[in-house]
Amino acid sequence: MAHYSYLDSNSVVVTVTVGKDETELINGLDTETYYAQGTPYTVKRTSYNTYGGVHSGGGVPFRKNYASIGYTYDTERDAFIAPKPYPSWVLDEATCLWGAPVARPSEGLWLWDEATLSWIKR
């Protein structure tokens, strides 16, 4: 079993479905091509075991992150990237995850405050 994301014309994920294993051909077509047939979407396989470029089961990470609705597929990075949570946050190229411009304190619960560009203790 594998998971497939459907991308609109802006490469934004509109849905994610379960399908046949990616190593199988269906009617002579690779699975991404097969599932895209008859739709206005581009289909890209995604792995629910991959987050931040790491495979949770120790396997090979795939496309940096599991695709979710609203994520963007970046063809240059071959990665799924979440929407940017705050204007000041920066994309980590290695993980394709967004990070605050200031490191979060390690102890306690903190919320990001975009107005002050700092962490506020909860």
Where are these regions (language model features)?
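Interaction-interface detector
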Residues: 1-122
